[in-house]
């Protein structure tokens, strides 16, 4: 098991979100004019030019647009050639949501399986050999009954550690050895117990080597939310002061987002587009918004 997520976690900040979304407005409802968007991104100075070796052309948009599709702010341009912003992106642009509120909401709702991270890795296919017959990573995870929201899971594990009198902090090694092994939301309690036992020398699981990069990216992303704090090296994650102060409200949201019926369900056909319909929805997710000022 691994949790694939954008590899651009390190550049995520308010200015980047604002700049990329405003760049989208230049081509909203139209085919992407990459040159126009790239020039705008360079002009406002939010990201590097990213000159491609094969063409010697600036292509910041091609490299960074996945940040927006990853978090349900635009439909992936692979499935919709017209640049389409989702309702949740418009709520942000209309100042209904602040950046911390938006990123907290979307990371709490981010789930596996989903319709965006659908590409199969060659190593996964190879590991199953001739018996592998899945057309997408989404179908593969669905078949194996994966149903997971990493941000919610991590919060609940940290909260359980806090309730048990343990230090409410997870190291990257603990994420890699224990947390990533979870396949469902109910695993959070067993996972917390494994971690507590390991801290007292009673159990030790070998780290899942291939998961380390994804775990590190998740820690970086979660540092942008209201709920978590990290150290400067992004190799530990802890509950933020907001999480402790507002623990009843956060726990309520996390409990609701742990319920099976709250998850998007994979169905063959237009599952990729259906994912963006679900994940980019605003009105049906207002109840999950944790306000920055309370």
Regions found by a protein language model. Give the residues of each.
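Donor-sugar nucleotide-binding helix/loop cap in glycosyltransferases
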Residues: 1-294
């Amino acid at each position: 098991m691994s949790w694939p997520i954008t590899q651009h976690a390190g550049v995520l900040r308010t200015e980047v979100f604002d700049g990329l979304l405003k760049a989208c407005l230049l081509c909203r409802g139209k085919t992407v004019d990459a040159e126009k968007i790239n020039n705008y991104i360079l002009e406002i100075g939010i990201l590097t030019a990213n000159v491609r070796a094969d063409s010697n052309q600036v292509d910041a948009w091609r490299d960074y647009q996945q940040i927006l599709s990853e978090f349900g702010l635009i439909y992936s341009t692979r499935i919709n050639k017209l640049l389409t912003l989702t309702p949740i992106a418009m709520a942000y642009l209309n100042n209904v949501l602040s950046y911390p509120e938006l990123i907290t909401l979307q990371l709490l709702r981010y789930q596996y399986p989903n319709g965006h991270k659908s590409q199969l890795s060659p190593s996964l296919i190879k590991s199953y050999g001739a018996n592998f017959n899945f057309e997408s990573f989404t179908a593969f995870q669905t078949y194996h009954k994966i149903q997971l929201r990493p941000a919610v899971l991590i919060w609940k594990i940290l909260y359980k550690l806090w309730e048990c009198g343990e230090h409410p902090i997870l190291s990257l090694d603990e994420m890699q050895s224990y947390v990533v092994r979870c396949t469902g939301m109910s695993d959070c309690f067993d996972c917390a117990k494994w971690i507590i036992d390991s801290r007292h020398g009673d159990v030790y699981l070998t780290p899942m080597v291939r998961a380390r990069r994804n775990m590190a990216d998740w820690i970086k992303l979660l540092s942008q939310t209201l709920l978590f704090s990290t150290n400067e090296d992004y190799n530990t994650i802890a509950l933020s002061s907001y999480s402790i102060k507002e623990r009843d409200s956060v726990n309520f949201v996390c409990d609701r987002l742990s319920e099976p019926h709250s998850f998007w369900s994979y169905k063959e056909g237009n599952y990729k587009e259906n994912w963006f319909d679900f994940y980019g929805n605003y009105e049906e997710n207002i109840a999950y918004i944790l306000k920055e000022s309370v």
